[in-house]
């Protein structure tokens, strides 16, 4: 039984066996060991406890315990952060309520007084101090509230006027374009 050279076994004991110098039991054990795998196929070497010393196994247990403790600490931190956020929100609400109690933003004013105030605004958008003091007495408001109302109304009014102005310019330009007018001379 001659095999090609490239098919010859790599184990020296097998070379001797093929050459006719058998050692009996030794070869059978070598072949038996060669056929058996070092570990059964269903056993994962990473999960095997036999490969690790007790110190390594204890280290894994400590690592697992540290992982659980770490998760616990993370949960505690998250709960603490959530609690802090809730406290901040409650404090913010309390501060806003206190501000509203100190300085009520809106007071109910009759429509006729509001029309009067609006008429004063149309006549003079920036009242003098004497005018604003007389208005504050008339409307039973503070000087600060009157000046704030004028400031807010002025902002709204100016914004509305700029929108209208822009619309007028845009509409004027569109109407000119629709009639055939353009800014660039027509090329013929």
From Swiss-Prot:
Keywords: DNA-binding, Homeobox, Nucleus. Disulfide bonds: none annotated. Residues 57-106 have a biased composition (Basic and acidic residues). The keyword tRNA processing does not apply. GO terms for cellular component: nucleus. Gene3D superfamilies: Homeodomain-like (1.10.10.60). Residues 28-106 are annotated as: Disordered. This is NANOG neighbor homeobox.
